[in-house]
UniProtKB/Swiss-Prot annotation:
Single GO term (MF): fatty acyl-CoA hydrolase activity
CDD domains found in the cross-reference section: 4HBT (cd00586)
Family: Belongs to the 4-hydroxybenzoyl-CoA thioesterase family.
Catalytic class of the enzyme: hydrolase
SUPFAM superfamilies per the UniProt record, alphabetical: Thioesterase/thiol ester dehydrase-isomerase (SSF54637)
EC id: 3.1.2.-
Record protein name field: Putative acyl-CoA thioesterase YneP
Gene label: yneP
Domain of life of the native organism: Bacteria
Transmembrane helix as UniProt keyword: no
Functional description taken from the UniProt entry: Has acyl-CoA thioesterase activity.
Amino acid sequence: MHVSKKEIEVRYAETDQMGIVYHANYLVWMEVGRTALIKDLGFLYSDMEKKGVLSPVVDINISYKKPLHYGETAVVHTWIEDYNGFKTVYGYHIYNPAGELSIKATSSHICVDKESFKPIQFRKAFPDWHTAYEKAKK
């Protein structure tokens, strides 16, 4: 299983009135982690889009454990939790500077045609990605 690791410095604008990271910003960081994982595997999401394919989120689950604060550095760990050639489930752990788990999450994605939004078979449309995902998954 390949785990991508990406550091993110918490910016002031990402915090709320309580002085902690606003909950929705973790979703943005998950996307940053997912993009880093794809790059680690030798691909670019933008190349998929150039071929007229999008990969929307179809399900998301997030559990908040410990808050992060302005000025701290978060570390996003991302991996392929499950993959069946059609749907990909990415797993995420985001850690605080003490190495404590801040969030635990998954997001599920499928591929669709950009124009029709009809689902497509990832393994058929991107056989090289398929091979890499099979090797990298949990």
